[in-house]
């Protein structure tokens, strides 16, 4: 059963300008150490940050809160498996929120893409029915 769907699109130039202006302060505010390491080791770090940023927004929408009501940037962590597939780990208030929504086992599916100036993320949260 689907409990939430979220989508977000962001202009990559906005992330590029923010990184240029605030640098490490912005990165450390919005991204975990794992996300920073992964993004910095990508062919195009700015695009990687933008996709992760969009995924955090999309996930917070799927949780029904947006990045408000106690959900913070680092509460949603976008990392990759050994094959490069992105997945989401919830921490702190985001984890508390999903545990309020359901006590059952859940999955979070995320899809990321970028093209020229835009990055997009789609997130679906569903309960495993067994």
Listing of model-derived features with the role each one plays in the protein:
Residues 1-130:
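Core catalytic alpha/beta fold that binds nucleotide/phospho-ligands
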């Amino acid at each position: 059963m689907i409990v939430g769907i979220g989508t977000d699109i962001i202009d990559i130039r906005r992330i590029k300008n923010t990184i240029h202006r605030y640098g490490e302060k912005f990165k450390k505010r919005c991204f975990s150490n794992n996300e920073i390491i992964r993004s910095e080791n990508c062919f195009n770090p700015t695009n990687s940050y933008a996709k992760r940023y969009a995924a955090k927004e999309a996930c917070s929408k799927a949780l029904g809160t947006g990045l408000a009501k106690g959900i913070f940037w680092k509460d949603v962590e976008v990392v990759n498996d050994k094959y490069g597939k992105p997945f989401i780990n919830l921490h702190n208030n985001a984890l508390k929120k999903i545990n309020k929504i359901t006590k059952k086992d859940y999955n979070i599916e995320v899809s990321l893409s970028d093209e020229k100036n835009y990055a997009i993320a789609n997130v679906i949260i569903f309960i495993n029915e067994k």
